[in-house]
Amino acid sequence: MNKRASGVLMHITSLPGDYGIGSFGQAAYDFVDFLKETKQTYWQILPLTTTSYGDSPYQSFSAVAGNTHFIDLDFLIRDKFLTKADVKGADFGLDPEFIDYAKVYEARRPILEKAVKAILADKKEAKKFEAFKTKNANWLADYAEFMAIKEHFDNKALQEWDDKKAVKRDKATLEKLRKELAEVITYHEVVQYLFFSQWAELKDYANENGIQIIGDMPIYISADSVEVWTQPHLFKLDAECKPRYIAGVPPDNFSATGQLWGNPIYAWDKHKAENYAWWVFRIQESFKLYDYLRIDHFKGFSDFWEIPGGDETAENGEWVPGPGYDLFKVVKKELGDLNIIAEDLGNIDDKTRQLLADCGYPGMKIVQFGFYDTTGNSIDIPHVYTQHSVAYTGTHDNEVINGWYDNLTQEQRDYTDAYINRRQGEPITRALLRTLFATVSNTAIATMQDILDKPENSRTNFPNTVGENWKWRMLPGEITVDKKEFLTDITERYNRGNN
């Protein structure tokens, strides 16, 4: 990221389509075409991992396995693994702009089960699946077993499974369950084959058209995950895999009680003793999917907020030293120089800044944050940005521009309008996007909602809440000629064009 360029943040879930949720189908290829046409370089997405409670891509059943909601059904029909009759009449939800996750899950499962049977019955495809299974043996079998056993126990979280011997991976218990659940285990293996096959085709298409994929890696793992089940020694857990300490961030101006994320805390001493092998593996697997990798909550590698496991708020936590540069030194030694972006937002201190400098990764800048202080002294105001950074209007955790602007005070709105030289009648989204692309940051990333001038209810996520997040989808036809021309204009005007 050492030259001026730009891109768009748009998660797969938010792509339009007929089956209730975005996928790796034609709409994704059309989106690549849109990026190419508007001279973009990057497509930034959120984690592709399988989602769990709350539908958050940052709370996953696995650090590696893919979200099977993204498998495109039309492509399965094209490839003769499904028929149109298999999907006809299924209820994926009625609202094309907001995802109904319960309906999507219920409708897709029996359809995907039919596709799995067709693949296993096709000798050529079954052979490809077996090759995939062998290539990914270091994680796939454990994941498929975890998901099958989880379903066997009515989809309860790992810590609530009825048979505690299964939680503790008793050998005889697991052998019995493997035999009993063999068909379900195979299902979970095959749908992973489909996920990775379709993603590889889409990524190849993006790369062939000059578009690089920026992926995302959460720092933490869900307590209800295959990693906690198979490698409990790497986390601070009790004998039943329940977290003794959980992750979050302390109270601040935006949250009086802090944020309680609920993820188990790493036993960093155990990771160090194993030369951070799990982290090397995890990052290596990520770069099989992406060209660049945003690492979430980079502060947590410097110091992390550790909260007692039973607490209901983040108030009683404390800062505990993280692994620091020791981890990234090993990653560099094992994997070489990597295209990593550090999410360095929030409680950033000199120690974290030093870690970022030692690693050499670009950090992030959020344009919205610069205008709460109307004196011009904010550390987030655009005139203090540096070239070695990635600038955003906002991320998935922030308000869309229209919602953000509406919630400013009149003084803040007046200051913002004057600072960005907003023209009479100019939409605030366009004025702020223009400001973003004009910054000295080598990389500028615009959220799709802002390009489309969407209202407040299109926000992707409201941190520390569950139930109404990760739902927004773009509607067919929303990318108008006018919007494409505007994006192309600011991209070329500020020397970010990918020619």
Task: Identify the role of each PLM range.
Residues 1-30, 38-39:
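Mature N-terminal, pre-catalytic/accessory segment of carbohydrate-active enzymes
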Residues 11, 55-192, 196, 221-445, ...:
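Alpha-amylase-like alpha-glycosidases and glucanotransferases acting on alpha-linked glucans and related
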Residues 26-33, 197-205, 279-281, 428-432:
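Short alpha-helical segments and helix-capping/turn motifs at coil-helix boundaries
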Residues 26-51, 289-290:
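Catalytic domains of carbohydrate-active enzymes, especially glycoside hydrolases
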Residues 36, 199-207, 332, 356-357:
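Surface-exposed amphipathic alpha-helices with a cationic face
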Residues 37, 148, 165-168, 173, ...:
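Domain-scale activation on soluble regions of proteins
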Residues 188-221:
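Conserved, well-ordered alpha-helix/loop/beta-strand core segments that scaffold catalytic motifs
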